[in-house]
Amino acid sequence: MVKKNSFISVITQEEKEENSGSVEFQVFHFTSKIRRLTSHLELHKRDFLSQKGLRIILGKRQRLLTYLSKKNKVRYKKLTDQLNIREPKIS
């Protein structure tokens, strides 16, 4: 059985049902998957397929965040603050 994450939900249940395609919901969903995979990989360090899946999900989330930052900086900042997502390093 899958445990629910203990961090605060940014999106209410009604919003999840209505806006499952919104960028905020997708980032929230990817973040919960990332946290679940990270805790799994702490126990199973040699699970290379899960590591690859984690990298893929991280890339998808980063592309969505880049899109959101270009379209609406206020929503981007609010979402990253609520989900405790770090700003990407600019090289």
UniProtKB/Swiss-Prot annotation:
It is found in: Plastid, Chloroplast. Gene3D superfamilies: S15/NS1, RNA-binding (1.10.287.10). It holds the Pfam family Ribosomal_S15. InterPro entries: Ribosomal_uS15 (IPR000589), Ribosomal_uS15_bac-type (IPR005290), uS15_NS1_RNA-bd_sf (IPR009068). GO terms for molecular function: structural constituent of ribosome. The keyword Nucleus does not apply. Keywords: Chloroplast, Plastid, Ribonucleoprotein, Ribosomal protein. One of its GO terms (biological process) is translation. GO terms for cellular component: chloroplast; ribonucleoprotein complex; ribosome. Part of the 30S ribosomal subunit. PANTHER family: RIBOSOMAL PROTEIN S15, BACTERIAL AND ORGANELLAR, SMALL RIBOSOMAL SUBUNIT PROTEIN US15M. Belongs to the universal ribosomal protein uS15 family. This is Small ribosomal subunit protein uS15c. The gene is rps15.
